[in-house]
Each structure stands twice: as C-alpha cells, then as structure tokens.
C-alpha cells in the first residue's frame, strides 16, 4: 500500500453530489428534544410571535426565529458562554446542525447574524418563549407554583474597571487622578504619585460617581472570590412545591449594587406573572396548585422589617432565616413586629426547616447548572436588555433539561453520554467476570 500525503493545497469541486456529503446519525438527546418541541408546536408558536419583526414580503434573507432560539438553547446544553462560540460549535457538528434545522449542504449562520437577530426580537418575546417552556413543565407535572425560593448571584460584566468614566465630567479614571494630583501641588505626577493619591482617596468605587461608557447598566461590586469587578445581579425564583423538581419560574437582572431586600418583591412579582400566564393553559393549570406564589423561602440576606411586611401585606407567608441583630425595639412598629414574629415561628417549625433545606438544595443547584457548567458566569454581551434576552433562553434550556431528565433520565447530552459509558463499562465488567468463571471451570477440570 502506497503512503498518501496530506494535500496542503487543493481545488474544491464546482459541484458536489448529495450522496458524497458526510453522513452522521443524529444525536439521540437532541433528536428527542426536537420531538418534544415538535409535539408542543414550538415552531408555529415562535413564528407567530416573531412575525411582526420581519417583512411580510421581500426583505433580505434572515436567520429564522426558530433557528435563533435553538442557537441560544445550545448555549446551555453545550456549556458555551459566547454567541461566537455557539456559532463555531454549530458549524463543526452535524448533529447540532440537524437539531437547529440546517441541511447538510447549508452554511450555518455566523455570530454577527445571531447578534443582529437578537437585537431585532424584543425582550418581551424572549419572555414569552420562557413562559412557553414553563407551560411544558407544568403539563408534565413538574411545576407546583405555591412555594417559591429566591436567591441571587453576581455575573461578571463584559466591561473593565480601568475603562470607567465619571458620570458628571466624563473623565477617565486616569485623568481624574491626574487632576487630583495636580490640585494637591504635583504638576507632573508619576505613576507612584497617582497610586498614592488613589490609596488616600475615599469612596473609590462609588457607583454614584462612576460608570462604564459602553455598559452603563453594569455596577461596581465585590465578587464572591473577593475581587472587584463591574457586574450584574441575576436573581432566580425557583419552584419548591411538593413534588417539584426545582424549575426556575422567573429570572431578573439588575445592577450588582442593588440589595436583596430591594429586589425580592419585583422577582416574586415576575414569578407570579409567569405562573399566571402558564395557568391560562387548562392542561397546565390542572397540574398546578390553585394558589400561586403564596410562600417565599429565602436566605438571611433578604431579612428586614420592610421585606417581611411587604410579603405579609401581599398575603405571602415568609420563611426567611433571621440574622442575629441583638435586642429589638418595636415602639411604633407593631405591624413590623407581627410580621417578624410570625416569620420566626414559621422557620422554627418542621415545615420551615424542611423548606429551608430544600431552598439550599434546589436554588443553589440552578446557579451551578446555569452559570458554572452552563457557562454564563462571565458575560460576553453588554447592556441589561441584551444580557437578559440571552439569559431567559439559557434558563429555558435548564428548564427543558428537567423535562428531558424525566423522560429519558438525563438532562444534558454529556449526561446521556455518561450513561452510555456506564452501560458499556457494566457489560465489560460482566464479560470479565464470565471469563474468570470459565477460567476457573477449565482449571477444575
């Protein structure tokens, strides 16, 4: 046999027969996911929602909305953080092409087309797709709706601290320090002089004074590892009802400087609106609790007189651990006292302890799956609206994984691959045992 050599320069054929194109079987996970989407009429639903954003006749060729949303779902299932990475991964995989809806001979869309389509379709439409996915979960009996756990995490923004500018004068940080040094008598300050001025200055990271010119919605904040970055705060409302599996029923995005007590009620309000939209479907409503968002379970960061009073006034029972604040004084605060004491009684009961444990399990798990293995901890988009669009569909991918876990036992393609590897290992082990038994039998003879 003659040795062939890799051709570094070749002339591509002008025409290529369809039979000569590479063939590969569809990925069983994505094939089953596409079946679920087809059974629930995903394509007609999305096309109807997005019709107002496209020209009725003529117009330049575009990325179909059903392909666009499948693109974003791949970000979760493949653990890809950027739209550029999603486009590269799709172009390199025949099974992913089949999932999105590309023929073998079709060129896939690049990241700029994906970005342009995201800007074309508004935030409300992304929210409606998120609600549509929740309806699938409800029809499968995976949403209860009465008890909601809430927690938040920080996401690093695609913006560097060294690029921030002052809100009033639009000076850069370097220009601002230079002006302060000159005002103190240093005509030509060196780097050491600027560093000294910076160390001696108070309120260096004030969000009231500084912003990023290209991402004004991001806020200066300390991350969990102790570093300081421009960041956003993503807050999840997770279903914790009896028989629930931890579906995310609402996700909100705000600047990282907003406290937990300030964002609790808006997040619960969004959860209530989403669940009410889901309950409009009779089949989904039959599987859900008649009372929606009637219990809120959080960590101690959400505990305050005001937040507990707000929950009490809306008829929502709170299960919020109380931090040690020493002796409390209730003069003129009888309503706040009543709400705090009622919450204290609930968290000390057996049901309260059980719900707090469930919150720690289910809510924290959503952060691990969506932001760590799902690849969204570090953002690559700028602007709250752009990020929230991507985040809503990314979280929808997590919710769809709960449906897949119920139907096929695994929620991601990697999980299914691990299951197959386990079966292969089991058969290999059985084969080794059989060989050992046969060897012992032959020896005894």
Predicted regions mapped to residue ranges:
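Short, flexible loop/hinge motifs at secondary-structure junctions
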Residues: 1-23, 416
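Anion-binding and metal-coordination hotspots
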Residues: 80-91, 102-445
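Basic, short loop/linker segments at the boundary and entry of helix-turn-helix/winged-helix-like folds
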Residues: 26-73, 78
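Secretory-pathway/luminal and periplasmic proteins that interact with or process carbohydrate-rich
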Residues: 95-101
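A short, ordered amphipathic alpha-helix with a cationic face
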Residues: 19, 59-62, 102-104
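Short amphipathic alpha-helical interaction patches enriched in hydrophobic/aromatic residues
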Residues: 54, 75-76, 98, 118-121
């Amino acid at each position: 046999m003659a040795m062939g050599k890799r051709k570094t320069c070749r002339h591509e054929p002008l025409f290529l027969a369809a039979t000569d194109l590479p063939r590969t079987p569809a990925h069983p996970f994505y094939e089953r996911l596409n079946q679920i989407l087809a059974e629930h009429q995903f394509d007609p639903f999305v096309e109807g929602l997005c019709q107002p954003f496209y020209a009725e006749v003529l117009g330049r060729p575009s990325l179909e909305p059903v392909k666009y949303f499948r693109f974003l779902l791949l970000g979760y299932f493949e653990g890809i953080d950027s739209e550029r990475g999603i486009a590269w991964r799709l172009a390199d995989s025949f099974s992913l092409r089949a999932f999105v809806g590309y023929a073998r001979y079709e060129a896939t869309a690049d990241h700029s087309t994906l970005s342009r389509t995201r800007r074309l379709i508004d935030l409300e439409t992304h929210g409606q797709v998120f609600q549509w996915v929740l309806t699938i979960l409800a029809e499968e009996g995976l949403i209860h709706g009465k008890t909601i756990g809430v927690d938040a995490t920080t996401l690093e923004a695609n913006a560097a601290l060294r690029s921030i500018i002052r809100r009033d004068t639009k000076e850069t940080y370097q220009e601002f320090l230079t002006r302060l040094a000159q005002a103190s008598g240093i005509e030509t300050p060196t780097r050491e002089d600027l560093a000294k001025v910076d160390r001696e200055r108070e309120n260096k990271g004030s969000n009231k004074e500084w912003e990023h010119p290209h991402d004004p919605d991001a806020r200066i904040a300390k991350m969990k590892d102790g570093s300081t970055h421009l960041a956003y705060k993503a807050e999840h409302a997770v279903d914790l009802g009896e028989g629930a599996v931890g579906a995310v029923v609402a996700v909100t995005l705000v600047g990282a400087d907003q406290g937990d007590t300030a964002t609790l009620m808006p997040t619960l309000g969004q959860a209530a609106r989403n669940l009410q939209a889901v309950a409009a479907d009779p089949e989904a409503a039959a599987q859900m609790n008649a009372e929606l968002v009637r219990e809120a379970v959080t960590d101690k960061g959400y505990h305050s007189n005001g937040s507990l009073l707000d929950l009490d006034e809306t008829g929502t029972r709170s299960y919020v651990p109380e931090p040690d604040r020493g002796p409390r004084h209730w003069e003129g605060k009888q309503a706040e006292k009543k709400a705090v004491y009622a919450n204290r009684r609930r968290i000390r009961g057996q049901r309260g302890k059980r719900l707090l444990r469930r919150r720690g399990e289910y809510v924290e798990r959503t952060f691990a799956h969506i932001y760590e293995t799902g690849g969204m901890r570090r953002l690559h988009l700028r602007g709250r609206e752009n990020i929230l669009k991507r985040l809503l569909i990314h979280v929808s991918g997590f919710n769809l994984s709960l449906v897949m876990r119920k139907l096929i036992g695994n929620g991601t393609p990697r999980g299914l691959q691990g299951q197959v590897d386990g079966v292969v290992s089991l058969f290999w082990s059985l084969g080794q045992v059989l060989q050992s038994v046969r060897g012992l039998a032959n020896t005894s003879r």
